[in-house]
Amino acid sequence: MTGSITLRGFGWRPLGRRAPVVAGLDLRVEPGERVLLAGPSGAGKSTVLRAVAGVLATAGDGDLLGEVETEGRIGLLLQNPGDAVVAERIGRDVAFGLENARVAPDAMWPRVRAALEAVRLPYGVQHPTAALSGGELQRAALAGVLASRADVLLLDEPTSMLDDANAEGVRRCITDVVAESGATLVVVEHRLAPWLDHVDRVVVLGRDGEVVADTDPATFAATMRDDLASAGVWMPGVSAPEPVEPPAALVVPHRRPAPTLEAVALSVDLRRTDMRGTVVAAALREVDATLAPDAVTVLGGPSGAGKSTLLATLGGLQRPTAGEVRGLGMPPHRMRSRALAAVVGWVPQNPEHGFLTTRVRDEVAATSRPVGVDVDVDAVLAHLGLDRLADANPYRLSGGEQRRLALGAALAHRPSVLLLDEPTVGQDRGTWAAVAGWMRAAAHGGAVVAAASHDSALVSCADHVVRLADGRNAVPAPRVEEAR
């Protein structure tokens, strides 16, 4: 029946892994059902979505067991929306699926524009995809899925990189589309509360990929709160856990004292060139920011405000158009890679783009060797909950596991400056506490710690907040108000 999903004894073991990510999973989703799929980091939620979409075993990189049946046209939003970008311009990217479905141009482009408007993306169809922020890429990818008018919508953390206002708008857009079309919806999220009023059913996977809860939202919220919160699930009404700090020896900067890093009247233009010509986008305009040692600073603001660009410029990965970065003795973009890496640890928004090896253990040590710092790899992996994956391939981890690995790899050599782009995306309660604890312990040890984030729980742990809007400094709000 169109829109139905059936898994019988489904299992998946990635190539090179001894244990399966998911084993013996039985699940039936009826046509038109709206299902919230939850569970701790690494439980196999994304694996299930990819299996249902039929894209899990296409590269022959694992063993698939059991049966998976999906009836109807499928729209899949990947956990990392950048993985789905196929065109240089937003319009062509959103239209890609429609072109493959042979939708006539006179019908296709109105659907493309309507989808972009629905996801609140404020750009025309000619805007370059390379100039989009992570949150904007997420909305562009969702627009492509919604424009397809699929019978089954599979959405992997569709709001994880969005500010609260845009996240609410996207949820409303999704539920409106589902209500109008009658499509089946399976959405994966870690932060469950905003979705409970929009779904019929909540399915929770355990750490071994087994179903530990399958019920309606009201029963889920009323009877399972404490048990599932202790298992790592972000339950409604349960406050964020206390950060768990690693031993000081893992995080205290190997070079002290750490510098105060300053952005002074910083402006950045992003230039993108394709066959149509060069497009210049103003990413930052005269931004001032001070990142002090012994403190955690969060860069806040809506999607597309310039947070990632500011981090990249502070870390020497982006050359400023005007203004300067002070504190490292010379402009960071002019420093040699080894000298910069010894001082600055940077975790990008898409962590898998920076992996250098094919084994988790080796990845943690990869940066430390060139800069001459000994690292207790086992202790780093244990704190980040990756010890059982020490011999796994980094590219076959879950999104949350990849993000923690990137953090361990970038920070294990104890740099003086930590620049983290959305470090808590894809984390359950336990792994969130480990990431937040690493940040806080590094700051207590004298490091400069800065993170771009929409996570209000992380903001509540910050000592300072720098807010951006439209590439400029916004009026800063008190930290307590930010946390709300």
Give the role of each language-model region.
Residues L153-E157, L418-E422:
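Catalytic Walker B motif of ABC-type/P-loop ATPase nucleotide-binding domains
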Residues D61-I74, G323-P331, L340:
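Conserved ABC transporter NBD signature motif
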Residues L142, V170, L407-G408:
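Hydrophobic anchor residue at the start of the ABC signature
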Residues D208-V233, R472-R484:
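Conserved beta-strand-loop-alpha-helix hinge in the C-terminal portion
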Residues P128-L132, E136, N393-L397, E401:
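Conserved ABC ATPase signature
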Residues V145-L146, A410-L411:
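ABC ATPase C-loop
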Residues A53, G315:
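Helix-to-loop junction immediately C-terminal to a conserved catalytic motif
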Residues A107-G124, G372-L389:
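Conserved ABC ATPase "signature" region
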